Amino acid sequence: MSMDNENIIGIDLGATNIRGGIVIDNKLSKITSNRIHSSGTVEEVMQDVFGLVDNLIDKNIKAIGIGVPSVVDVKEGIVYDVQYIPSWKEVPLKKRMEDRYKIPVLVNNDANCFALGEHYFGKGKGCDSMIGLTIGTGIGAGIILNNHLYSGANCGAGEFGMVDYLDKCYEYYGSGQFFQNVYHIDGEIVFKNAEKGDPKAIKMYEEMGTHLGNAIKTILYTYDVELIILGGSVRFAYAFFSNKMWERIRTFAFTKSAERVQIKISELENSGILGAAALYYDMSA
């Protein structure tokens, strides 16, 4: 679907701040941000959201998309147990915003928005089957199949980090948690040491890369996609773990899939905002 002449607000709700902007003719403009009272009441946080949207809204806005770090009932627009905002449990975000602004509002998980952002604006353009894989303190994923976001029957698709693995799960071993969980050291310290050439730090990344490679194999067994785009903070250490990651991927049983799948590193700025706006285009296409 063409995005020309469609003015859509995209909102990226994070742990400490909320960011938003307007997508006009495929370009992001009027980027703004506010602090979030993450320890506040439901209503206090809601007013933070309203305050940002009030600064962006005008009569030309056709819809609002918002990405949140939470499981989301996409149809009803209810967010459950939002990370880092304890009071936000079963919040009817879609209804509250539509009641206020009188235009369509779409709500989805932030990893799904990342995938949509890459699909419409980033390295996933022109690819009809891909996964946006975010690797930070956890693992999240957004799945694009046949050029559409796939959320699953209960809006829980893409939670690969929760798949059982060894004695825990993939997220425990294949994300930034790995360093604290296994070696009891902060991941940022490991990254800085690896940049200095510390062999112990590089070895830790290689070990994490082995686990991540196994996670990606599981993804490929489940969804035989053309492309995986890595986002999240751990992607900046790709040079330290990529070889071991690929060693595991190449043991995939279906040789053609392992040979053909591409893994790219996200370079898209404001992917959360862009992806939230793209929720409207995904719905309308």
Located regions from the model:
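ATP-binding/phosphotransfer module of carbohydrate and carboxylate kinases, centering on a glycine-rich
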Residues: M1-A63, D73-I78, K95-I103, E118-G122, ...
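A cytosolic small-molecule/anion-sensing beta-strand core signal
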Residues: I24, V68, K75, L145-N146
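A short acidic/small-residue loop/turn micro-motif
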Residues: I36-S38, S87-W88, A157-E159
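A charged helix-plus-loop insertion that forms the helical arch/lid used to bind
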Residues: G77-E90
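General beta-strand structural signal in soluble alpha/beta enzymes
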Residues: V105-N109
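Acidic/histidine-rich catalytic cores of soluble enzymes
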Residues: A115
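Glycine-rich phosphate-binding loop of actin/hexokinase-like ATP-binding domains
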Residues: K125-Q177
